UniProtKB/Swiss-Prot annotation:
Stated name of the protein: Dynactin subunit 4
Cysteines paired by S-S bonds: none
Gene name of the record: Dctn4
Coarse class of the protein's main subcellular location: cytoplasm
Keywords: Acetylation, Coiled coil, Cytoplasm, Cytoskeleton, Isopeptide bond, Phosphoprotein, Ubl conjugation
Organism: Mus musculus (Mouse)
Length: 467
């Protein structure tokens, strides 16, 4: 019975750019293509950036300037939990009369889990609750900025050279109207510069004088190459003999979370600005319709569009697994659940020999030969005890039980291997009423919803074989 909750035992095959097998709860269904979609075959689009602690929302440009981190929230450098601001009272001398003191509020950062505080690393307390915390300076900041500036200029030069070669090849085919426009150069660092097209009849040799910024003197950035050091500083003599206090040594994770400083001791751990999270939309690459689109507000957990597959495709689950033995036929109980409100007709089919999708099967399966009818989903009917059940004239050898929009069926499994996991594969053919807006106008007498038949490849894992 526990297998009923183990949805990862039942995998659906997605026929996308690459074949993906995943539980139905991790898949999406495109109503326009009428196909399953996984995270591997959709386009991911960033809608908004927000801080998971203070829920501050910011546009992408601002998030890029802040290096995708929140300016007001911090993570503990020891245990990576969110730091909270604590207030305390300290006595300070009055500027007019040094002999007298007054109480003043001071704020510091503290972790409620590992008890780390900003005072442990010598950070001064602040008179305001937010902002202005002391941050360690990276000793290599100037070198990195110089390298970034150099490679940005190098990318612009390469872009100009490529455009010059393109114009040289096309100089005899450029029309007059086209030659009066400009080319907008966008390099890999998202920096743009505009190059003026040559006048009609002008020689292409005039392009040789083009600079990166027309009308401006572009100063060439020069960098000093890194120098290899022949001699390195030796380790202290007591490096291998002195006792190590593990509480004062940082872990590998703590060092990798601060790659610019690489702290060795716990006294060098400084708080890190909290990483921003994103709300993203998923779009089908084939028809470019949205499969998932969340609300813009960070406090909202609702979705404007959420085409998850469990709301459209019948779900198969394993209810009970008997003792499976080599070359002995066993009866397995499965459940089929109809997620839509209308009747759904389902037919289970065995995989053909030589089926390229049937590569993981290790057992022979016998599925019900008859068509199964699943009742529509009705949330109110589940609590109505006086509702009369529908008579579907089920065969007791095939259907074990029926309740609301769920039906239990028997399949027969015969393992074909002496050891290993028992896996069976079959095809599930079902009808689907496409509720998406039709492209053509609906004529009089024509049905508004189109009924189509879909086929899903399902793989069931029953666990290890008994001896």
């Amino acid at each position: 019975m526990a297998s009923l909750l183990q949805s990862e035992r039942v995998l659906y095959l997605v026929q996308g750019e690459k074949k993906v097998r995943a539980p139905l709860s991790q898949l999406y269904f495109c109503r326009y293509c009428s196909e399953l979609r996984s995270l591997e075959c959709v386009s991911h689009e960033v809608d908004s950036h927000y801080c998971p602690s203070c829920l501050e929302n910011m546009p992408s440009a601002e998030a890029k300037l802040k290096k995708n981190r929140c300016a007001n929230c911090f993570d503990c450098p020891g245990c990576m939990h969110t730091l909270s601001t604590r207030a305390t009272s300290i006595s300070t001398q009055l500027p007019d009369d040094p002999a007298k003191t007054t109480m003043k509020k001071a704020y510091y950062l503290a972790c409620g889990f590992c008890r780390w505080t900003s005072r442990d690393v010598g950070m001064a307390d602040k008179s305001v609750a937010s902002g202005g915390w002391q941050e360690p300076e990276n000793p290599h900041t100037q070198r990195m900025n110089k390298l970034i500036e150099y490679y940005q200029q190098l990318a612009q030069k390469e872009k100009v050279e490529r455009d010059r070669k393109k114009l040289a090849r096309r100089r005899n085919y450029m029309p007059l109207a086209f030659s009066q426009h400009t080319i907008h150069v966008v390099d890999k660092y998202s920096l743009g510069t505009r190059l003026q097209r040559p006048r009609a009849g002008a020689s292409i040799s005039t392009l040789a004088g083009l600079s990166l910024r027309e009308g401006e003197d572009q100063k060439e950035v020069k960098i000093e190459p890194a120098q290899a050091v022949a001699e390195v500083e030796p380790l202290p003599e007591d490096y291998y003999t002195r006792p190590v206090n593990l509480t004062e040594v940082t872990t590998l994770q703590q060092r990798l979370l601060q790659p610019d400083l690489q702290p060795v001791s716990a006294s060098q751990l400084y708080p890190r600005h909290k990483h921003l999270l994103i709300k993203r939309s998923l779009r089908c690459r084939k028809c470019e319709h949205n499969l998932s689109k969340p609300e813009f507000n960070p406090t909202s957990i609702k979705f404007k569009i959420q085409l998850v597959a469990v709301n459209y495709i019948p779900e198969v689950r394993i209810m009970s697994i008997p003792n499976l033995r080599y070359m002995k036929e066993s009866q397995v109980l499965l459940t089929l659940t109809n997620p839509v409100e209308n009747l759904t007709h389902v037919t289970l089919l065995e995989c053909d020999e030589g089926d390229p999708d049937n590569i993981n099967s290790t057992a022979k399966v016998v599925v019900p030969p008859k068509e199964l009818i699943l009742a529509g989903k009705d949330a109110a009917a589940e609590y109505d005890e006086l509702a009369e059940p529908q008579d579907f004239q089920d065969d007791p050898d095939i259907v074990a039980f029926r309740k609301a929009n769920k039906v239990g069926i028997f399949i027969k499994v015969t393992p074909q291997r002496e050891e290993g996991e028992v896996t069976v594969c079959f095809k599930m053919k079902h009808d689907f009423k496409n509720l998406a807006a039709p492209i053509r106008p609906v004529e009089e007498g024509d049905q508004g919803t189109e009924v189509i038949w879909l086929t899903q490849h399902v793989e069931l894992s029953f666990g290890p074989l008994l001896p």
